[in-house]
Swiss-Prot record:
Organism for this UniProt entry: Pongo pygmaeus
Domain annotation bHLH: ranges: 109-160
Name of the protein: Twist-related protein 1
GO molecular-function terms, A-Z: DNA-binding transcription factor activity, RNA polymerase II-specific; protein dimerization activity; RNA polymerase II transcription regulatory region sequence-specific DNA binding
Function: Acts as a transcriptional regulator. Inhibits myogenesis by sequestrating E proteins, inhibiting trans-activation by MEF2, and inhibiting DNA-binding by MYOD1 through physical interaction. This interaction probably involves the basic domains of both proteins. Also represses expression of pro-inflammatory cytokines such as TNFA and IL1B. Regulates cranial suture patterning and fusion. Activates transcription as a heterodimer with E proteins. Regulates gene expression differentially, depending on dimer composition.
Length: 203
């Protein structure tokens, strides 16, 4: 029996059966790996599909911010239009600035002419009051303003009218204008100091 077992060779059929049994066992792990890969890929696809609407929505929202989107193009055109309007406003300002020096020069000329006329008027008025003060008898203590000078001139005219109506002046004295003027000046000063000027203020 020992000889039969040891001497009996293994048949090729038995080898093929053993090989065929071993091959499925070897082939099963790769199939399991492939199934795992397929499951992983399907799970990834399902996850991608679930996130697809959200991604599409986010893509839709972000699409408005893309530089190539139509809304962005319209905004760019509007901003360009506003920039053009600003440029036009700047151009208008430059044109108005070009015309401003002429108006400024005209205003300066008008001011200069007005100042010259005012100086001439003031000078002529001062000369007239200086001449009037030479005619009106005044006291050394008089510091008369222009209004007071005019009032004193009116009172002096009233005094002269009263003197002409009286017969106090002698014909000889009247012939000498210088002496007459001195006497009138003295009489007018006395008249002022006696208060006759204040009494005749109602005239």
């Amino acid at each position: 029996m020992m000889q039969d077992v040891s001497s009996s060779p293994v048949s090729p059929a038995d080898d093929s059966l053993s090989n065929s049994e071993e091959e499925p066992d070897r082939q099963q792990p790769p199939s399991g790996k492939r199934g795992g890969r397929k499951r992983r890929s399907s799970s990834r696809r399902s996850a991608g599909g679930g996130a697809g609407p959200g991604g599409a929505a986010s893509g839709g929202v972000g699409g408005g911010d893309e530089p190539g989107s139509p809304a962005q193009g319209k905004r760019g055109k509007k901003s360009a239009g506003c920039g053009g309007g600003g440029g036009g406003g700047a151009g208008g300002g430059s044109s108005s600035g070009g015309g401003s020096p002429q108006s400024y020069e005209e205003l300066q000329t008008q001011r200069v002419m007005a100042n010259v006329r005012e100086r001439q008027r003031t000078q002529s008025l001062n000369e007239a009051f200086a001449a009037l003060r030479k005619i009106i008898p005044t006291l050394p203590s008089d510091k008369l303003s222009k209004i007071q000078t005019l009032k004193l001139a009116a009172r002096y005219i009233d005094f002269l009218y009263q003197v002409l109506q009286s017969d106090e002046l002698d014909s000889k004295m009247a012939s000498c204008s210088y002496v007459a003027h001195e006497r009138l000046s003295y009489a007018f000063s006395v008249w002022r100091m006696e208060g006759a000027w204040s009494m005749s203020a109602s005239h």
